[in-house]
């Protein structure tokens, strides 16, 4: 009954070991420019500006892709993603990274096809350079005070819930680490789960606002830990659904 489970992964420092934006600009020797511009631009616009500088410096799309393929993704996470997909779980990514970075890394590790949806900032190639645009454009602001202007993950969870079939109940597992993962956590129901990373902002915000969180909380502190917890959780939820289904049929 794993087909009744929807798993939403944050990307940076959750599904992958590091932050994809920082991974690229540090390896392209743009850390100082990042520091200079950080106070003046929102993150999404800053990343687009750094990509412009990479293009000026002669870095190609292939150079960026090669850099991304060096991003660590723990084998245990690759394994649990494949396992969850094989069991029928609906896997999605909700991230403030971008389509190009996420697709390149997931394809490199052979798990891109395991995900039904990648919800993130769009990326396009324009005259030989990579451009990043906000998921929520300025023409239609999301109005959420908890999230950056370009992406509200809480709204994404709401959209996922609306898209689910009313004829079959689904349970959500949300996995994240950052402060922008708190808003989607608040959209989860009592039968759902949130998996925050230990010693990161999401867990801190949950701890300070536990009365607002309806979902069950399961902490993790490493990729191996996450894979074990997620695997066991899928098994337990599947067994619960089987028992519930059998009881209903009696």
Locate each region found by the language model:
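C-terminal cap/substrate-recognition subdomain and adjoining C-terminal extension
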Residues: 76-82, 86-90, 97-250
